[in-house]
Amino acid sequence: MMIPSQSCFCFFFMVSFFLHTLASPTLRHCRHDQRNALLEFKHEFPRVNESNQIPYDVSLSSWNKSIDCCSWEGVTCDAISSEVISLNLSHVPLNNSLKPNSGLFKLQHLHNLTLSNCSLYGDIPSSLGNLFRLTLLDLSYNYLVGQVPPSIGNLSRLTILDLWDNKLVGQLPASIGNLTQLEYLIFSHNKFSGNIPVTFSNLTKLLVVNLYNNSFESMLPLDMSGFQNLDYFNVGENSFSGTLPKSLFTIPSLRWANLEGNMFKGPIEFRNMYSPSTRLQYLFLSQNKFDGPIPDTLSQYLNLIELDLSFNNLTGSFPTFLFTIPTLERVNLEGNHLKGPVEFGNMSSSSSLKFLNFAQNEFNGSIPESVSQYLNLEELHLSFNNFIGTIPRSISKLAKLEYFCLEDNNMVGEVPSWLWRLTMVALSNNSFNSFGESSEGLDETQVQWLDLSSNSFQGPFPHWICKLRSLEILIMSDNRFNGSIPPCLSSFMVSLTDLILRNNSLSGPLPDIFVNATKLLSLDVSRNKLDGVLPKSLIHCKAMQLLNVRSNKIKDKFPSWLGSLPSLHVLILRSNEFYGTLYQPHASIGFQSLRVIDVSHNDLIGTLPSFYFSSWREMSRLTGEDGDFRLSEAPYMGKVLNATAFFVDSMEIVNKGVETEFKRINEENKVINFSGNRFSGNIPESIGLLKELRHLNLSSNAFTGNIPQSLANLMKLEALDLSLNQLSGQIPQGLGSLSFMSTMNFSYNFLEGPVPKSTQFQGQNCSAFMENPKLNGLEEICRETDRVPNPKPQESKDLSEPEEHVINWIAAGIAYGPGVVCGLVIGHIFLSHKHECWFMEKFRRKKPKVVTRIARPSKH
């Protein structure tokens, strides 16, 4: 007979064993109807890859009848009822749409449904509303289109609704107000539009609201005080308007508020708040239309870590009061109209400061010595202001400083050598004229980016720069350096990506130092006095995208060997002494990646075979075709460093003696300029293959024969100059259909027959057709008031006196926009804070002058 204690032990053991058996999904089979519904759902996606070799989070290889469905990957069953309560197929490539009668909707007991990153497309079926027990619905990172169905309101138990990064459109349904248990609403990166429904105010349990990067408009709800649990509020990059919703900042739990990139206006006003949010840590109000002064009430947010008020219309003086906030780490005031001196005072309470950006304002006076009290400072951006004087010695005390941007000010004097320990030094467009103690401390240099362009430096090229062995980008353009380029620059060629020395007085040959320059993207030595030949070591620059040697005295055969560089997009040899033929039968034609080529005003000769342009694939590939150019690939159109900003490049046009500069070369610019040489023979018929060509200048040569009919295929052509040749025959009537062509010149040839009667032709000046006696149909074009005398044509290569009738399209080398340099690094520190794909947004900003960008959080 058992003693009582033994009986109790046996009883509890049996009960525990029974409960364990009941709860174990592996010991209890799932219901047949659940299994069949799952298999039906699986069979709706016949192209799903079930290979275990593919590193997806879940595969469907385990979904077969020989295995209990509660053990299938991604499936979770209730321990008692064996109903499927969770389905997580994240990253399984379903590659199909959700069908309205899908087996998925037979799983009536689902609580959690995660189909993120499954390559789903098509509409969200309204039958999704049948899964009324859902508490979590995640359809993020797919290609879903259409509107959110009103049946979403049936999911009244939802606490998490995530539709991030799809292609959904239209207004949100009013039924969304039925989701009264919702805590996480994530609709960012879609195309939603219209107003926020009034029923949105029912969602009082919300912790996170993320509507970032849509097209919502109108005003935000005036009263948001009902969202007492709200922690994260992100409506950035929409079209909301009106004034700042003050009630938002009375929510005591609010920690993160992002309203940037909208059309809010009026003053930034926090007054009359009974209970300011003491938890607020991140406030982003940039890229709106706020005006007036920065309110001193901001200083009441004593937990504030990051404040971004950039690119508004704020006025007033420097907001010294901000620097009383002890937790403040980042302040961005760039792109406003703030004036006066910068005065920090004795504000050591803000010792946490890591980032200060006051660029593009109207601050003046000296840079304050007191900035040195912020010992944790990593970035200091003061570009585009009116600062004067010299760089304060006290800044050298900032041991953690990495990025120092002072472009476009009125600074003078010497550049101190302690700057070389930083990562980035950008001092362009000032009046610096010397270097202090340049050789000291260079063995410990860390500088990777050095921009000394557009200052007053003169004399021989400084050899001490060769000791900056970590350099990646060196910009010394637009100064008065003379003498030769030192061969010792080879010391950092292994790391260099950009070497910009244009517009100085450098002489001698370009040194043969590029054997190890495998990372070099851009080389610009234009507008100097260089002579000799192009160094053959350039053939090792396999990454090179831009080569500009314009306006020198280089005397060499045309470098057809450059055609083997796989990434060469821009080649500018203009105004040198290159000679010989472009086409060399023994060499590969190459130049498959060229987008801009300018060999004008040289001494090139010979004929071009009819197939000459047939290998120029980049100019023949229509935008949007497979493998299309990405902005981030080309420094002349958008050079990226740390995915944070871009260079600005230019295109110049000499028209009737006036040189006009376009401030931006974008990915659509495709240019050929062969003018001012001695090419002869027919214009190659293969020119018609270059479907993307925008500007074609073959003027001032000796081309003969007819104008190729294939030119009519260049539907994107905007400018055509065939003047000063020996062309004969008729102007192809098909050219009249080129609707984008606004500028043309056929003068000084032997053309005959009728001029096309299209609007593009009839709108030209008479001078575009002069000295073609047999042309007819010019009555409307050459009215008496438009007639001009026919000057004797001159074929001089002197760029200072161009003929009035000649249009020379020039793709200039990298014309770095002032202050753009600083933008290249601002996101480097911020990437861990807001985690946005900064670069793609940068090139879609509503404000074209923006040069800085703060990164985004993990979800928008």
Swiss-Prot record:
Glycosylation sites: 49, 64, 88, 95, 112, 117, 154, 178, 202, 213, 313, 346, 364, 429, 482, 503, 516, 642, 673, 697, 745, 765
Cell membrane as UniProt keyword: yes
GO cellular component: plasma membrane
InterPro entries (alphabetical): Leu-rich_rpt, Leu-rich_rpt_typical-subtyp, LRR_dom_sf, LRR_N_plant-typ, LRR_R13L4/SHOC2-like
Cytoplasmic compartment segments: 831-860
Main location: membrane
Gene of this entry: RLP31
Organism name: Arabidopsis thaliana
Location of this chain's protein in the cell: Cell membrane
Ranges facing Extracellular side: 24-809
Placement of LRR repeats on the sequence: 108-131, 132-155, 156-179, 181-202, 203-226, 227-251, 252-276, 277-301, 302-325, 326-349, 350-374, 376-398, 400-419, 420-444, 446-468, 469-494, 496-517, 518-541, 543-564, 565-591, 592-615, 665-690, 691-714, 716-738, 740-763
Protein name per Swiss-Prot or TrEMBL: Receptor-like protein 31
Record's bilayer topology term: Single-pass type I membrane protein
Pfam families xref list: LRR_1, LRR_14, LRR_8, LRRNT_2
